[in-house]
Regions:
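Active-site mouth loops of central-metabolism enzymes
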Residues: 59-72, 95, 121-134, 203-207
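C-terminal cap of metal-dependent C-N hydrolases
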Residues: 8, 317-320, 341, 372-426
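Histidine-rich, glycine-flanked metal-binding segment
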Residues: 1-55
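Divalent metal-coordination and catalytic microenvironments
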Residues: 8, 23, 28, 49, ...
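His/Asp/Glu-enriched, well-ordered alpha-helical/loop segment
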Residues: 199-227, 274, 295-296, 300-301, ...
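Metal-associated gating/positioning segment near the N- to mid-region
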Residues: 47-112
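Histidine/acidic residue-rich metal-binding segments in metalloenzymes
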Residues: 135-302
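Alpha-helix-loop-beta-strand connector modules within alpha/beta enzyme cores
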Residues: 102-119, 167-178, 330, 334
């Protein structure tokens, strides 16, 4: 099967190609990238006016499978990923039961293989049952295909156990994906601690909840030599510490989510639990630091922290509702609208942060690139097409987004995974 993508603006961070060209895919590999390819193909896609990028890689997704499949499952999550231009995703292990052994990891892997839409990589939990007490079978899970370990949803508060996990990760050459949150300081907080939390009469979450664990994790990573990836950074000091750590030669990377670079606590509509996520929406000053950090490549990655819940679960008070919003189907549009169109990052940086850099961090040698011989994972995006975000269009089970009704630019037109068209905008 040959697919020829014609006349698109090809953006490849691997080769630094940034021009109008054609891309020829044959079976599951990229065959050729150059101007005016004449070869016959089974399918020709006219990408005039569109970006043609390596398939996006989302390092931070909650598929809720097994055990929480009323919120999402491997199939619906994969469909949402494909609609969002994501051809590879990392699923977090905070499921029910927790993915803390090779057998449970294989369950997700097998389900994703049967689904056969996008590449689903399952991260393994750092500790058994995510209780923070005993290490999981990290080596067994890595042998079974885990690209990384994480305790996402919480931090491992026992620093010695965490250090031992980092030592294993360093030996196995896998990253640790860190959710930085000192649970002892949260105190039932449900939004950022600022004048808005006071106004709403809600308990707040201060920046130090994140910052103290960012500092700890960076220092343990320095000591162990493991690669630390900071998930969903939200504070100005996380940007400072990440920058200083990189200057110090520590192997560390960081991600920002679209909701944190788009919104602040000033945007929260009182009582609307679609604005409740963890870490919370911070201040304008914090958001500004995230934008500067994205622009200056302090932050390597844009991920979604896609966290679906049912409307019933979210339809309670701000204090009682679960944290989290969906993001797979809106991340491209928000990145183009809020970052590319406003001059914070270039289209090339977008491709780096949403594909090339995640591939490097996760050691996915054949992903994140449009070089001939690499995997035929490609996304075609119309950066100029405007539309209004509407949860009725979502294929995810989760409709919990604060972006309902927002007018955005940038639409995924075609997603190709392994040389197969897995999504097409009709």
């Amino acid at each position: 099967m040959k697919i020829l993508i014609k006349n698109g603006h090809v953006i490849d961070p691997d080769t630094k190609l940034d021009q109008v060209a054609d891309v020829l895919l044959e079976d599951d590999k990229i065959q050729e990238v150059k101007e005016n390819i004449k070869e016959e193909a089974d399918r020709v896609i006219d990408a005039k006016g569109c970006y043609v990028m390596p398939g996006l890689i989302d390092m931070h997704v909650h598929l809720r499978d097994p055990g929480l499949t009323h919120k999402e499952d491997v199939v619906t999550g994969s469909k949402a990923a494909a609609r969002g231009g994501v051809t590879t995703l990392v699923a977090m292990p905070n499921t029910k039961p927790v993915i803390d052994n090779p057998e449970r990891l294989s369950y997700v892997k097998n389900k994703a293989t049967q689904c056969n839409l996008v590449n689903v990589l399952q991260a393994g939990a750092i500790t058994q049952g995510m209780k923070g007490e005993e290490l999981s079978d990290i080596e067994g899970m890595v042998r079974a295909g885990a690209p990384a370990i994480s305790e996402d949803g919480k931090s491992v508060m026992n620093a010695q156990i965490y250090k031992e996990a980092m030592q294993i990760a360093a030996r196995l050459n896998i990253p640790v994906l860190a959710h930085c949150e000192d649970i002892h300081m949260v105190n039932g907080g449900c939004m950022n601690e600022d004048t808005n939390s006071e106004k709403f009469g809600l308990p707040g979450i201060c920046n130090a909840v994140e910052d103290t664990i960012v500092a700890r994790d960076i220092l343990i990573a320095k000591d162990t030599g493991c690669h630390l990836h900071l998930c969903h950074c939200s504070t100005k000091d996380s940007e400072v510490m990440l920058r200083l750590a990189k200057e110090d030669g520590i192997s560390v990377s960081g991600e920002v989510c679209p909701h944190h670079f788009t919104l602040t606590s000033d945007d929260i509509v009182e009582g609307d639990t679609n604005y409740k996520m963890n870490p919370p929406l911070r201040t304008k000053e914090d958001r500004q630091a995230l934008l500067e950090g994205l622009k200056n490549d302090v932050f390597d990655v844009i991920s979604t922290d896609h966290a679906p819940h049912t409307m019933v679960e979210k339809g309670v008070s701000m204090k009682s509702a679960p944290f989290g919003i969906v993001g797979l189907e809106t991340s491209v549009s928000l990145t183009i609208t809020e970052l590319v169109d406003k001059g914070w990052i270039t289209p090339m940086q977008m491709a780096e942060k949403m594909s090339y850099n995640p591939a490097k961090i996760l050691h996915l040698a054949n992903k994140g690139s449009l070089k001939p011989g690499k995997d035929a994972d490609v996304v075609v995006i119309d950066p100029k097409e405007s539309y209004v975000i509407d949860v009725k269009d979502f294929v995810s089970k989760g409709k919990n987004t604060p972006f309902q009704g927002k007018k955005v630019n940038g639409k995924v037109k075609v997603t190709i995974c392994g040389g197969r068209v897995v999504y097409e905008d009709k």
